[in-house]
């Protein structure tokens, strides 16, 4: 796809390449560039036009929308794909907040519940819950940020194993639940259900706890359509969503994405559909119209120009 941002090459500090974001270290600040890379199975599957812009601007919208709840690391947005952020010391715990019992992966809450697990991450769940049911109140099922696999962990273990102090856990977990409650309310006003999400927190140079990374994006969160949810749940049907799962399924059907060294190229119409779904989600989540880039040149050049202009 022409003008997709898959790689960045910028003359600013040391570069760290993640699955989706490229980070440039300026010392006390970070340049976070969200690319169009579509990741799954621990590898890059494809490039999706405008995906990076959707993720970055969705996060920016939520950062601005939630700063009265908790401060965040955002400093400036010099380009639709770029956020300038404070460098923070990140807590090694991901705050996974769930409003519904759902999921299909091996670590998902519903998969564990189906196996008979009733205590998960220190939370006791009652018998009789059904898949996709709304929980009585949102819960945090934290995971540790480890090199190979993230591990579900209870708040007691987080403190006992030295991942965080009790005081820091109490403050961050309170922020996480308040952010999620606000996110659910805003999503419902926009015709969506915020099903679950993950947050990351850090401590800035002044010692304050701040929200970092991303917030309520289509990559860090699951959204369902609000209209029709209850009727579908009562009928035992899956909720309607605007999902990216179909791209993963295409690769599973056409190769072994875990073992095959070279992956087949996803059909162009699949990529176009995925791009339109990301844009649709952005417009539903934020209630704002998506602004397409009118510059037909390489995205990396545009980003370089905009960052240089911001730096003065």
UniProtKB/Swiss-Prot annotation:
GO molecular function ontology, one term from the record: ATP binding
Upper classification of the organism: Bacteria, Pseudomonadati, Pseudomonadota, Gammaproteobacteria, Legionellales
Q: Which InterPro entries match?
A: SAICAR_synt/ADE2_N (IPR028923), SAICAR_synthetase_CS (IPR018236)
Q: What processes in GO biological process is this protein linked to?
A: 'de novo' IMP biosynthetic process
Similarity field: Belongs to the SAICAR synthetase family.
Checking Pfam families in the record gives: SAICAR_synt
Enzyme class per UniProt: ligase
Q: In which pathway does it act?
A: Purine metabolism; IMP biosynthesis via de novo pathway; 5-amino-1-(5-phospho-D-ribosyl)imidazole-4-carboxamide from 5-amino-1-(5-phospho-D-ribosyl)imidazole-4-carboxylate: step 1/2
Gene Ontology cellular-component terms listed: cytoplasm
| Gene3D superfamilies documented for this protein | ATP-grasp fold, B domain, Phosphorylase Kinase, domain 1
Coiled-coil spans are none
Which keywords belong to this entry?
ATP-binding, Ligase, Nucleotide-binding, Purine biosynthesis
**Which protein, by its recorded name, is this?**
Phosphoribosylaminoimidazole-succinocarboxamide synthase
Top-level taxonomic group: Bacteria
Q: What is the annotated signal peptide range for this record?
A: none
Read off the CDD domains from this record: SAICAR_synt_Sc
Which HAMAP family does this UniProt record tie to the protein?
SAICAR_synth
Instruction: From the UniProt record, list the reaction(s) this protein catalyses.
Output: 5-amino-1-(5-phospho-D-ribosyl)imidazole-4-carboxylate + L-aspartate + ATP = (2S)-2-[5-amino-1-(5-phospho-beta-D-ribosyl)imidazole-4-carboxamido]succinate + ADP + phosphate + 2 H(+)
Under which EC number(s) is this enzyme classified? 6.3.2.6
């Amino acid at each position: 796809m022409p003008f997709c941002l898959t790689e960045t090459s910028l003359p600013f500090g040391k570069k760290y390449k993640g699955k989706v974001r490229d980070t440039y270290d300026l010392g006390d600040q970070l340049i976070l560039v969200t690319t169009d890379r579509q990741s799954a199975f621990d590898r890059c599957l494809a490039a999706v036009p405008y995906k990076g812009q959707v993720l970055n601007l969705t996060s920016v919208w939520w950062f601005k929308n939630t700063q009265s709840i908790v401060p965040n690391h955002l400093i400036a947005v010099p380009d639709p794909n770029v956020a300038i952020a404070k460098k923070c010391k990140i807590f090694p715990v991901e705050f996974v907040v769930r409003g519904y019992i759902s999921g299909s992966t091996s670590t998902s809450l519903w998969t564990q519940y189906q196996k008979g697990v009733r205590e998960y991450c220190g939370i006791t769940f009652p018998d009789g819950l059904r898949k996709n049911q709304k929980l009585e109140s949102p819960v945090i099922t934290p995971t540790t940020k480890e090199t190979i696999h993230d591990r579900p962990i209870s708040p007691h273990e987080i403190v006992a194993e030295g991942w965080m102090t009790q005081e820091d856990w109490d403050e961050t977990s309170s922020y996480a639940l308040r952010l999620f409650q606000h996110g659910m309310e805003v999503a419902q006003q926009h015709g969506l259900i915020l099903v679950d999400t993950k947050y990351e927190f850090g401590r800035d140079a002044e010692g304050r706890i701040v929200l970092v990374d991303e917030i309520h994006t289509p990559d860090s969160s699951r959204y369902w359509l609000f209209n029709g949810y209850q009727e579908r749940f009562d009928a035992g049907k899956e909720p309607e969503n605007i999902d990216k799962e179909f791209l993963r399924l295409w690769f599973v059907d056409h190769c072994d994405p875990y073992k095959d060294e070279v992956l087949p190229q996803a059909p162009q119409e699949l990529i176009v559909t995925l791009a339109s779904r990301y844009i649709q989600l952005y417009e539903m989540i934020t209630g704002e119209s998506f602004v397409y880039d009118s510059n037909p040149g390489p995205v990396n050049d545009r980003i370089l120009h905009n960052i240089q202009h911001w730096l003065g």
